[in-house]
UniProtKB/Swiss-Prot annotation:
This is Uncharacterized protein C3orf38 homolog. GO terms for biological process: apoptotic process. It holds the Pfam family DUF4518. Keywords: Apoptosis. The keyword Transferase does not apply. The keyword Oxidoreductase does not apply. InterPro entries: NTF2-like_dom_sf (IPR032710), UPF_C3orf38 (IPR026698). Residues 105-125 are annotated as: Disordered. May be involved in apoptosis regulation.
Length: 313
């Protein structure tokens, strides 16, 4: 798992953009031991960031030339003597990224009565807006969008309809992946890059197709007073013309305060059960099991991964 913070990852992404394509591909081969075969430049950069254990490990690579780090710092307004050695340039880059969060803290105003009034008015406005949200419609539209986008990344279905990536997730998103096929396992993934890549690999490398059950039994919705919306959906898992089993997926969504009518994924619980683990001789239609009362526990610990109910078709 990557050791880069979100700020370091974004900084390194901009720095790597200064390398040419051959250098990017060569660096990707070195870092991943040629175990990852990127389709293009952006795939290679994602792999470099994901598999780098630290900023030092990445920037000390011979393929990341001293001149590149110097040029990046110059574009960010960090003026350093041209003769500065590479290890000092790396430290300057690390220091620069650490400072990116500090201005936000300093800009926070001191609590005064007028500010309290503005905050109170803003909170009241947000609460009124929250009351206007149709969570059922939001959940239905989200599920349709999410699964169409994810499934479109399956190379067996032709070119993707839109770009998949970490931009659809909060940077500290969590994914809990439980699968019961030939073996049982639960694996946790953290961070937008890691989570987006793991979900992408299901359809792009394992050629799976997730078909959600969008009727009343296959979906449930709930919302917390803090603005978190929980969307649950069940469905079947396919590869080509073969049905491999069923899945249950629960999303936690939070509205993006900077972009109107935009929600991002805060956490996901994904449970896949292989056909061999289902009762033989029955066609099963999965149904979501969580109730609105489960929301508080799910919101606090994000560990709900209970058994799936089945309804005979």
């Amino acid at each position: 798992m990557t050791g880069l913070s979100y700020t370091e990852m974004e900084g390194c992404r901009n720095l790597l953009s200064l390398l040419d394509n051959d250098e990017i591909m060569a660096l990707c081969d070195t870092i991943t031991n040629r175990l990852v075969q990127p389709e293009d430049r952006q795939d290679a950069i994602r792999a470099i960031l994901v598999y780098s254990q630290s900023v030092e490990e990445l920037l000390r690579r011979r393929k990341v030339h001293r001149e590149i780090i110097f040029k990046y710092l110059a574009t960010q307004g960090v003026i350093i003597p041209p003769a500065t050695e590479k290890h000092n340039l790396i430290q300057h880059a690390k220091d620069y990224w650490k400072k990116q969060l500090q201005p936000k803290l300093k800009e926070t105003p001191e609590p005064v009565k007028t500010e309290d009034i503005r905050l109170s008015e803003q909170q009241e406005k947000e609460e009124k807006n929250a009351e206007k949200v149709d969570f059922r419609r939001l959940g239905e539209e989200f599920c349709q969008w999410f699964f169409e986008l994810l499934n479109s990344q399956n190379p067996l279905l032709g070119p993707p309809q839109d770009e998949w990536g970490p931009q659809h997730f909060w940077h500290d998103v969590k994914l809990r992946f439980y699968y019961n096929t030939s073996e049982q396992n639960v694996i946790d993934y953290h961070g937008a890059e890691i989570v987006s890549l793991r979900l992408l690999s299901l359809v792009k490398e394992e050629y799976l197709f997730l078909s959600p059950n969008l009727d009343s039994h296959g979906q449930k919705y709930a919302a917390s007073p803090h603005g978190l919306v929980m969307v649950g959906v069940a469905g079947t898992v396919h590869r080509g013309n073969t049905c491999l089993g069923i899945f249950e997926q629960i999303f936690g969504l939070i509205r993006c305060p900077f972009v109107e009518n935009t929600w991002k994924i805060k956490f996901i619980n994904l449970r896949i059960i292989g056909e061999s683990s289902l009762a033989p001789g029955r066609l099963m239609k999965p149904a979501i099991t969580f109730e609105p009362s489960d929301l508080e526990a799910f919101y606090n610990v994000n560990t709900l991964c209970g058994p799936v109910k089945y309804n005979s078709m």
